[in-house]
Amino acid sequence: MAESTALLHSMTTWLAPWEFSPLWGLACLTAAIVYMRGARRLGRHHPAVGWSRPIAFLAGLALVYIVTQTHYDYLSQYMFFPHRAQHLVLHHAAPFLMALALPGAALAAGLPMRIARPSRRLRPLVDLLQHPLVAPLLFVGLIYFWLIPEVHFNAMLSQDLYQLMNWSMFIDGVLFWWLVLTPSGRLGHGRRILLLLAVVPPQILLGAYLTFSPTVLFDVYEVCGRAWPLAPLVDQQIGGLITWIPATMMSVIGTLIVLRQLRRDETRRQRMPPSRTPRDVIG
């Protein structure tokens, strides 16, 4: 009984915020409420809802909460490889799951009109950030930028810069994965696959560089002290592998999903009756 109580206390402590950020907590809670409100309005049998999509969307939000509002955030600030795993979640895994849910219809249905109308003013900015030439450059560029040793050093020592870094990664991840996984979006299947493949080589190069670098590139973790007694170079090598392999696999999985969407659309098109010409109607 005592062991169970101690385990429960340990889990509760770990799940409690390390440094509570009202903005992250409010964002996760608001997104969940708006989505579920919209899903309820549309109905469970609506094609935009179903049962798997809410699970994917809420799982993405849960991952965001875990890496930003639990004691995992402590590890992310005092070890390099947990930090890279945190950004893998914020920039890849969580936005991927949320975009996979195709939540546009549910979010639109759940958003109060007084908020929905002003939010349309952001459309030109979103269109710019999701431009086919801008989106992959921004997606890869942010990863490189925040891993410039001098920039990374300052970001890990400044609470404001640290939050800016995490928010920029998450927002850009949502914009990118929403663009490439939405079948009825602004891009066709081929262009979405090209974008997914375009971001792979730069991530491989960066991950390989971090993994095989003979020197420690990020000494901020020595200044602050590491959470675990792990050799600095080993910490960096594991972080490099996280930047390299899982991030690349996300693009591969995304490509397979788009190919599946393409096959489904072609099957649906073949099942449609041929369109009748005016001559057919007259005859």
Residue spans for each PLM region:
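Alpha-helical membrane segments of multi-pass proteins
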Residues: M1-G283
